[in-house]
UniProtKB/Swiss-Prot annotation:
<feature type="domain" description="Rho-GAP">
    <location>
        <begin position="23"/>
        <end position="212"/>
    </location>
</feature>
<dbReference type="InterPro" id="IPR039102">
    <property type="entry name" value="FAM13"/>
</dbReference>
<feature type="compositionally biased region" description="Polar residues">
    <location>
        <begin position="573"/>
        <end position="585"/>
    </location>
</feature>
<feature type="region of interest" description="Disordered">
    <location>
        <begin position="556"/>
        <end position="611"/>
    </location>
</feature>
<dbReference type="InterPro" id="IPR008936">
    <property type="entry name" value="Rho_GTPase_activation_prot"/>
</dbReference>
<dbReference type="InterPro" id="IPR000198">
    <property type="entry name" value="RhoGAP_dom"/>
</dbReference>
<dbReference type="GO" id="GO:0005096">
    <property type="term" value="F:GTPase activator activity"/>
</dbReference>
<feature type="compositionally biased region" description="Basic and acidic residues">
    <location>
        <begin position="596"/>
        <end position="611"/>
    </location>
</feature>
<feature type="site" description="Arginine finger; crucial for GTP hydrolysis by stabilizing the transition state">
    <location>
        <position position="62"/>
    </location>
</feature>
<protein>
    <recommendedName>
        <fullName>Protein FAM13B</fullName>
    </recommendedName>
</protein>
<keyword id="KW-0343">GTPase activation</keyword>
<feature type="compositionally biased region" description="Basic and acidic residues">
    <location>
        <begin position="556"/>
        <end position="565"/>
    </location>
</feature>
<dbReference type="Pfam" id="PF00620">
    <property type="entry name" value="RhoGAP"/>
</dbReference>
<comment type="similarity">
    <text>Belongs to the FAM13 family.</text>
</comment>
<dbReference type="GO" id="GO:0007165">
    <property type="term" value="P:signal transduction"/>
</dbReference>
Length: 851
């Protein structure tokens, strides 16, 4: 059996920083495994789980490991020691350690910016194919380390789901690991968001090979890992070449060189792109515009006609370097196709082509530098207009450029380095958010003239095949009407000079909560106690966060209240801060709309509260008529009351779903009749199900039949007391009738010998009641004193039993624990009832005497 161990743990311990948990992924990669983008602790734990997991066990991933073992393993890993999980841990502890590592990451595996857009994408799309394409694109915006870790985890979980589908489905695994990947935890306000996250995670596991292993559709992606591999391959192939850092003087006949010639722009175009995984750079040349320049000026001479490229040359790759010539004389664009085997320039001199063009025609020459990644599905052939001839001159074709004005290509000082040096813009981002490729920068629009030739369309980030050329401006669709765009290369969307969009209150609340939580964790680590309010108030920054958080929560609450009243239309969720404006443009409804026309939000009109109440009342009356129920509640039977209660309950739930629970006095006044009827029905049902204790004067108060306290009205409790007294008088009269009847029954039953034994106990009770009813006040007082003494004795005995039980078991005695003294409890209750009866009789016979 293969022993589960981390890859070269002993070697990486020396290079690894002192901590692993709570460290960003990029720092872990730089400190531990520069060539391996998955943290070694993740590989170590996953290998152990696959070897010794016993994944067929039910609930394995849902059982938490031993907390002490997990903490001990964490300390071992943080100290750089070599850990043998086979001997020192168990599977639940290893799984808990893996989840703890994901939870402790400062930035989740799915960064916050992409997380927000993923949630919006899952809500906007019902089409699975379209959702899959959009999701695949967003996943490839992840940083390389995050993408590799997510791919590794999804591969592991997908294997578990495929081999143990009956025990572990993709949905159950997504529910366990989804919150750890997205940093979404079980909070009341995040339950809906957690469901969306689990659904996205389940989709990644169910379609793992489509999202991660299918590389054929990823040529248009921004996967920086594939870009890195491509740059490394090109650097190895061109080690023997000139590195494209020299400047070559290009002789040309019939063209005069001016005294002040600008810099040299050298472009090296390779043909071996189709063998690689991705495209790092490409050059787009508007051949139509170039040949128009040929026809007008006649300064362009080519050695061979420019035709549509073959399939191998449809996508061209280049590295270009800008250098300052000491004499600042000439400008040249070196186009040198290289063979698949990386032949040197001496080996194939006939394959060199030199292209020089005038600087005043430069706006018609669109150069998408190495930051522009081309799609293989796009039409990349160079279109040449008919009727334009190309002259042949020797072996090299040259187009002379009199002056190169780089200001026409970029915004002056915003011109950046070519894309192969992409580490600079990768290091600029310190926030940990997902970065897009530099190809998706802002677009500068230039108005199209009437006689302007068609140019290449800007690369909108829509999915599927799109029109690559803009033809007649009048026939353009809504997405590209009346404007042509030129991409300005930027280092990233997180540039300091790029103005960010305003965040929503929900995003700001989450950000502030995260900052406050980090402060509390740091405070607890330093002082081993949670910060008090005085500690928070002592820190001005944290106090400011708390104040802003309170304001934002109040703002969200007010917005919800206003939206519920229909005062404002719901605001659309803003786009992600890192995605270009053109993203999702295909989602807009294009029919019958233009950019200048405001969109009309069609919202169903919510009926007023009065109209809803009238509708509910009408439905209740119809329902009672169908079931033949009386309108008066007092005439209803118990079954009728149950049906009426159910109908009222459903009606109130419908009202609250439309208008919310009534809060203000006006809202409660509108729906008051409905709530009052519901309360009255509940009270009558309770009253019908309760059997009152005979002879108790407080039956009414103990029977849960209290009337509701209505706001603004005085409650009359004395009337209820009078009613109880009247009920007591009627009770005593009824009791006398019962006693007299029982005496006559006794005289008749004495003659029946067959029923004598059965009726002895009843006769004894009746005689006792009769004697009690006919006794004088002194006799009643004597019985009262005896009953009190007996009650005191029983109470003392029961209290001793309960105290002994508490000392023995450490808890109070429950109902099932009182079985040994059950008879004593019953006797105690009987004596209490007798005492109440005696008190009533004494108070009725002689109200002037006090006990």
């Amino acid at each position: 059996m293969r022993k589960s161990s981390s890859p070269s743990l002993s070697n990486c311990n020396s290079d690894l920083a002192s901590k692993i948990f709570g460290i960003p992924l990029d720092e872990l990669q730089q400190g531990g495994h520069p060539d391996n983008e998955v943290p070694f602790i993740v590989r170590h734990v996953v290998d152990y789980i696959e070897e010794h997991g016993g994944l067929e066990q039910q609930g394995l991933f849902q059982v938490n490991g031993n907390a002490e073992t997990v903490e001990w393993l964490r300390q071992r890993y943080d100290s750089g020691e070599e850990v043998d999980l086979v001997k020192e841990a168990d599977v639940p502890s290893a799984i808990s350690l893996l989840r703890f590592f994901l939870q402790e990451l400062p930035e989740p595996v799915i960064p916050g910016s992409l997380h927000i857009h993923l949630l919006q994408l899952s809500q906007d799309y019902n089409n699975e194919d379209e959702f899959g394409r959009k999701l695949r694109f967003l996943l490839q915006q992840l940083p390389p380390v995050n993408y590799s870790l997510l791919k590794f985890l999804c591969r592991f979980l997908a294997n578990v789901a495929s081999h143990h589908e009956e025990i572990w489905s993709a949905n159950s695994l997504a529910a366990v690991f989804g919150p750890d990947v997205f940093h979404i935890y079980t909070d009341v306000e995040d339950m809906k968001e957690q469901e969306i996250v689990s659904r996205i995670m389940a989709g990644l596991l169910e379609n793992y090979y489509e999202f991660f292993e299918n590389e054929e559709e990823d040529f248009s992606s921004n996967d920086l890992s594939s870009i890195t591999e491509q740059v490394n391959e090109l650097s190895e192939e061109e080690e023997e070449d000139e590195k494209l850092e020299h400047i070559e003087e290009l002789p040309e006949e019939g063209v005069e060189k001016s005294a002040g010639m600008p810099e040299v722009l050298q472009l090296r175009m390779t043909e071996n792109l189709l063998d690689s995984d991705s495209v790092t750079a490409s050059t787009r040349i508007d051949a139509a515009a170039a040949t128009t320049t040929n026809a007008s000026d006649g300064n362009i001479k080519c050695s061979k006609p420019v035709a549509g490229t073959t399939a191998d040359n449809e996508v061209m790759q280049q590295d270009f370097v800008f250098e300052d010539q000491k004499n600042n004389e000439s400008v040249g664009i070196l186009l040198e196709p290289c063979s698949d085997h990386g032949d040197s320039e001496d080996g194939c001199p006939e394959r060199k082509e030199y292209l020089l063009c005038d600087s005043d025609k430069l706006p018609h020459l669109i150069l998408d530098s190495s930051s522009k990644i081309r799609d293989l599905n796009a039409n990349t052939e160079l279109e040449v207009t008919e009727g334009q001839s190309v002259g042949v001159q020797g072996e090299a074709a040259c187009i002379q450029i009199a002056q190169l004005d780089l200001k026409n290509v970029s915004d002056g000082d915003k011109w950046e380095e070519p894309f192969p040096a992409f580490k600079s813009w990768q290091e600029d981002c310190e926030s940990g958010e997902a970065q897009l490729s530099p190809q998706a920068a802002r677009m500068t629009h230039h108005p199209l003239g009437e006689d302007c030739p068609p140019v290449l369309s800007h690369r909108s980030l829509d999915f599927g095949q799109s029109q690559r050329f803009l033809h007649d401006p009048e026939a353009l669709d809504f997405s590209s009407k009346a404007l042509s765009f030129t991409r300005i290369r930027r280092s990233s969307f997180s540039s300091k000079d790029e103005k960010r969009e305003d965040r929503t209150p929900y995003q700001l609340v989450k950000k502030l909560q995260k900052k406050i939580r980090q402060f509390e964790e740091q405070f607890e680590r330093e002082r081993n106690s949670k910060p008090s309010y005085s500690d928070i108030a002592a820190n001005p920054k944290v106090l400011k966060w708390m104040t802003e958080l309170t304001k934002l929560r109040k703002q969200i609450k007010d917005a919800k209240h206003k939206n519920s009243d229909g005062e404002f239309a719901p605001q659309t969720r803003p786009r992600s801060n890192t995605l270009p404006k053109s993203f999702g443009s295909s989602l807009d409804h294009e029919d019958g709309e233009s950019e200048g026309e405001p969109r009309v939000i069609q919202k169903e009109k919510t009926p007023s509260k009065e109209a809803t109440l009238e509708l509910i009342t009408k439905r209740l009356k119809e329902n009672r008529a169908e079931r033949h129920l009386p309108e008066d509640i007092k005439k209803m039977t118990k079954d009728h009351l149950i049906e009426e209660k159910t109908s009222l309950q459903k009606s109130l739930l419908y009202y609250e779903s439309q208008h919310g629970r009534p809060v203000t006095r006006e809202e409660r006044h509108i729906v008051k009749p409905l709530y009052d009827r519901y309360r009255l029905v509940k009270q009558m049902l309770t009253r019908a199900s309760i059997t009152p204790v005979l002879g108790s004067p407080s039956t009414k108060r103990r029977g849960q039949m209290l009337q509701p306290i209505i706001e603004g009205e005085t409650a009359h409790f004395f009337e209820e007391i009078k009613e109880e007294e009247e009920d007591g008088v009627s009770l005593s009269s009824e009791l006398g009738d019962i006693l007299s009847t029982s005496v006559h029954t006794q005289s008749s039953l004495e003659n029946l010998e067959s029923d004598a034994e059965e009726n002895q106990e009843k006769l004894a009770r009746d005689l006792c009641l009769s004697s009690t009813r006919a006794a004088s006040v002194p006799e009643l007082l004597e019985q009262l004193w005896k009953a009190r003494a007996e009650k005191k004795k029983l109470r003392k005995m029961l209290r001793e039993f309960e105290e002994a039980f508490y000392q023995q078991n450490g808890r109070n005695a429950q109902k099932e624990d009182r079985v040994p003294v059950l008879e004593e409890y019953k006797e105690y209750k009987r004596i209490k009832a007798k005492l109440r009866l005696l008190e009533v009789l004494i108070s009725k016979q002689d109200s002037s005497k006090s006990i």
